[in-house]
Amino acid sequence: LRPLENKDINENYLSWINNTKENFYVESTKFPTSNYALNNYYETSLKSKNSILFAICNKKGTHIGNCSISQIDWINRKCIYGRMIGDKKNSPGGAGTQALQLLQRYAFYHLNLNLIWTGVCKKNIKSIKSNLRAGMKNVGKIPEALFINNIYEDVLIFSITKKQYHKINS
């Protein structure tokens, strides 16, 4: 992981966001995004004290995806995370899980947060397995929270606390 930089806001990134077939379950891909909107999102995020954007890179340093910590609650020490592998052909297997593990370490030990959570469509099996491999626990669900292909789908909630993370990684 490295900080997302202005040079990363390019046609490749835009094509990932607009690829609804490959990123079917990523909510930010539901509507077409323009270059202007993507740049605005990046600039707004840079100014925020409650979100941090990262580039996911392969071993060659190629930008293959993004992840974020957002809605940081500095009082209750918690945040939501999101991630997307956009360049699947240059992505080694397990890149999403590894990125999540690095994100967890950063959130717990650099930001001193206590809880990380996310919501995942129950049909997104790849993401569910990745969350479980990274030590996240399925702690509940929100019924019929997503409308996909004319069907309401449940969202599964995954979380991990600093104590759980430390127990797994010590």
Protein language model regions, located:
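Tryptophan-centered motif/residue detector
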Residues: 15-16, 28, 40-41, 74, ...
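Hydrophobic pocket/interface hotspot
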Residues: 12-13, 22, 38, 81
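Residue-level marker of structural boundaries
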Residues: 18-22, 31, 47, 163
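Conserved GNAT-fold acetyl-CoA-binding loop/helix
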Residues: 21-42
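Acyl-donor (CoA/ACP) binding surface of acyl/acetyltransferases
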Residues: 2-9, 19, 53, 58-170
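A short helix-loop-beta-strand connector motif used in the catalytic cores of GNAT acetyltransferases and
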Residues: 43-55
